[in-house]
Amino acid sequence: MSKANLTHHFLIAAPELSDPRFEQALIYICRHDKHGALGLMINRPLEQSRVGKLLEDLDIEVTDAQVMEDLALEGGPMYPEVGFVLHTGQPEWASSFAISENVCITTSQDILKRIAAGQGVGHYQLCLGHASWGKKQLDQELANGDWLVCPADLNLLFDTPFEERWQIAADKIGVNFDYLSSDIGHA
């Protein structure tokens, strides 16, 4: 069992992970404590869900043209109707908390209005839904070899193309999936 706090780390889905919802997933852990964990998949763009269109559906006027092109992400299978804004900066919004020194998560509409206007938010990703684990569940999945752990960094979190994130995270920790054995504990 892991005693480490994995907040502000990435979970890299092992190739043998049996749950197809997480195949080649890269999950950013927003919270990990004795009660469980919450994370957001950051490498699954929703091709039919542009951030601008989602904001317009909420009756938020979009004046920043880039927002009309930005893709929302599938954050995970839990509560896919709920939006989570992962962003740089400080937790200055109505429903916001800091994950690390310069990464926050916000669920209130005030940040969406600022994003729509292209104001006050540096890097951001709008994720629909989240992944969560109950008490000790993530520890068990780690012990089973379902996930690999990688320290988070802002470049991978916000700037790396979505389709490259899973592999680049594995590369960061020196893992070549072509040579990774699924037979845990045996040489």
Swiss-Prot record:
InterPro entries: AlgH-like
Gene Ontology CC entries for this record: cytosol
Family under the similarity heading: Belongs to the UPF0301 (AlgH) family.
The protein's name in its UniProt record: UPF0301 protein Psyc_0057
Organism: Psychrobacter arcticus (strain DSM 17307 / VKM B-2377 / 273-4)
Taxonomy of the source species: Bacteria, Pseudomonadati, Pseudomonadota, Gammaproteobacteria, Moraxellales
